[in-house]
Amino acid sequence: MLDLILKTIWLLLPCYTPNNFAVLVGGGTPIDFGKTFVDGKRILGDGKTWRGFVGGVAGGVLTANLQYAIEKLSGLAIYSSLPFNEFFTLTFLLAFGAMFGDLCGSFIKRRFGYERGSRFLIVDQLMFLLVALLIASLYPPFWKLFTAEIIALAVIITPALHMGINYIAYRLNLKEVPW
């Protein structure tokens, strides 16, 4: 079981890491350009910027390429079992999907009246993952690596990982709130 958990986490790193990169490189022009939706509330808010989105996707792809190099050097063959073009496309879709899922989560939170940085269980912990998996699953090589068992395990472990890592970041004064 531990092997399956570790493999699942390894496969999901390209969608677990983009939001961290987005925070590091973010800022600048909001994706919604400051516009409001028909309900009068901001579409996404100031926390979702073009630089953060692009930087997050690039960070996820960078993470995946580091994984690929580690696999090649160590003899491990998970992502590196795919031809490079399939690996690259798949991991790009995972990273893009994670960032797009985060935008979807922000949109939903704004509609329900949640402010930037406020806690909204399930949306905060799973939206990025579900959208990433949905988008990536449309690309056939996804199914060479992602079994139903891995997808189910991902949905189960991601909220706990998300909350645990955020709590650690909070305790290290890297985040203002523990969620």
From Swiss-Prot:
In what way does this protein cross or attach to the membrane? Multi-pass membrane protein
- Tell me which EC number(s) this protein carries: 2.7.7.67
Q: What keywords appear on the UniProt entry? A: Cell membrane, Lipid biosynthesis, Lipid metabolism, Magnesium, Membrane, Phospholipid biosynthesis, Phospholipid metabolism, Transferase, Transmembrane, Transmembrane helix
Q: Name one GO biological process term.
A: glycerophospholipid biosynthetic process
Q: What GO molecular function annotation could you give as one example from this UniProt entry?
A: CDP-2,3-bis-(O-geranylgeranyl)-sn-glycerol synthase activity
Q: Reaction catalysed by this chain?
A: 2,3-bis-O-(geranylgeranyl)-sn-glycerol 1-phosphate + CTP + H(+) = CDP-2,3-bis-O-(geranylgeranyl)-sn-glycerol + diphosphate
Which GO cellular component terms are attached? plasma membrane
Question: Its annotated pathway?
Answer: Membrane lipid metabolism; glycerophospholipid metabolism
Q: Which InterPro entries match?
A: CarS, CarS_archaea
Q: What is this protein called?
A: CDP-archaeol synthase
**Species classification:** Archaea, Methanobacteriati, Methanobacteriota, Archaeoglobi, Archaeoglobales
The gene name reads: carS
